[in-house]
């Protein structure tokens, strides 16, 4: 995930902090012509390395005019080991461009190994993000019967959707967890109960065409 300015950004820039529009850009062409990123956030995985240390989120300075160009300027360590952070996503994106109340200031980090979900505050101090919320696996299991969380994407509805690969018992199950992006409580599943795919993996959607495409591991 990327952030072009101190005020917001990521996934094509535009944090939505100006009050004239929501986050992101109205079109892909506008995104291509937007300002370049100054910071990027990189999940760093120590799970399975034998170090018994938690994964962390690295902040990298990618501003060519900065004295810290191409350097890791901050590391946010997770509170638990063996999480295996995976495909991160924002709390709000271009799907909310028309909503002036939305701001891209939270980074969502699902975990493959533990099914935990971390929510990181990138808005208060983009150079040194902090842990905002931890959604424990028990809440995910009890409300969705899904596990092994893979990819997080924000929706125009103000929710965050996270794909799953399996269930609590180790079976393959491709479903979608819905999280409220204001309260950060698990709401349930986007798919109807019993309507999961045999396997899950990545996904993306195109709201203008009312289409969602998902893949399997």
Range-by-range predicted roles:
Residues 49-53, 112-115, 168-173:
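Short, solvent-exposed loop/turn segments at conserved positions within beta-propeller repeat blades
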Residues 45-47, 110-112, 122, 165-167, ...:
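Short loop/turn segments immediately following the C-termini of beta-strands
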Residues 69-154:
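Blade-loop segments of beta-propeller domains
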Residues 32-45, 57:
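An edge-strand/N-cap motif at the start of beta-rich repeat modules
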Residues 4-9, 15-36, 84-103, 142-157, ...:
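Structural signature of eukaryotic scaffold interfaces centered on beta-propeller domains
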Residues 122-207:
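Asp-box/WD-like beta-propeller blade repeats and closely related beta-sheet repeat scaffolds
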Residues 57-62, 120-122, 179:
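Hydrophobic/aromatic beta-strand positions that recur at structurally equivalent sites within the blades
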């Amino acid at each position: 995930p990327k952030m072009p300015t101190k005020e917001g950004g990521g996934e094509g820039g535009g944090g939505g902090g100006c009050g004239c529009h929501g986050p992101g850009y109205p079109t892909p062409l506008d995104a291509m012509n937007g300002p370049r990123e100054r910071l990027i956030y990189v999940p760093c995985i120590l799970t399975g390395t034998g170090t018994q240390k938690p994964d962390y989120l690295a902040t990298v300075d990618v501003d060519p005019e900065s004295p810290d160009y191409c350097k890791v300027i901050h590391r946010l360590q997770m509170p638990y080991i063996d999480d295996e952070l995976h495909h991160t996503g924002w709390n709000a994106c271009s799907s909310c461009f028309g909503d002036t109340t939305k701001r891209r200031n939270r980074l969502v980090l699902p975990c493959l190994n533990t099914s935990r979900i971390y929510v990181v505050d990138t808005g208060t101090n983009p150079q040194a993000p902090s842990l905002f919320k931890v959604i424990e696996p028990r809440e995910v299991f009890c409300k969705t019967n899904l596990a092994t969380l893979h990819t997080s994407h924000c929706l125009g509805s103000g929710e965050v959707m996270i794909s799953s690969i399996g269930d609590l018992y180790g079976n393959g199950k491709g479903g979608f967890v819905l999280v409220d992006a204001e309260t950060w409580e698990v709401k349930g599943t986007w798919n109807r109960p019993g309507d999961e795919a045999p396997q899950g993996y990545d996904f993306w959607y195109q709201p203008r065409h009312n289409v969602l495409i998902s893949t399997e591991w």
